[in-house]
């Protein structure tokens, strides 16, 4: 779907809610994967994803035409924040490498599970802003879209991602972060 097509679909869905289906079908898997990575629980991810699309449908009239994906992920970001507040527990991360297709051997599953645990623990070492940037990048958003979600300029997102990658590289090689402001 091109941006102009999305705008047309959004405008049509404002008048006819059943026309929201193509937008839902296009973005559900991405939003659900993002929620799952943030929550680590498939049931909670499904619940929050449902809330995201419910809010999106009821708030279509507020969409201003930039990028529907950015707008939708901003709703997802806010829904997750609300979920964490309601749950009052520390945010958990999961599964930055999710790609289970049912075709892997038990050994491959074990390796994939360990890789997910490693990525999760590495991401948990990042400052909150860098972690959010990396999670949204893993969800497939561009720097501009991440900026719209987090209320920052694309250049600031690129810098945060660069710093996160340097920090992750240091963590992987055992050097950790030795210089710089890692916010």
Where are these regions (language model features)?
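Internal acidic/polar
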Residues: 3, 82, 90-116, 142
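Hydrophobic positions on the alpha-helical face of helix-turn-helix-like DNA-binding modules
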Residues: 52, 75, 133-134, 146-147, ...
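Short amphipathic alpha helix immediately N-terminal
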Residues: 24, 125-145, 149
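DNA-recognition helix of helix-turn-helix
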Residues: 144, 150-175
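Arg/Lys-rich amphipathic alpha helix in sigma70-family domain 2
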Residues: 37, 62, 74-94, 112
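Sigma70-family region 2
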Residues: 14, 40, 50-68, 86-88
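A short, charge-rich alpha-helical start-of-domain segment used by transcription regulators
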Residues: 10-33
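Short, Lys/Arg-enriched C-terminal cap helix and immediately downstream tail that follows
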Residues: 85, 126, 165-183
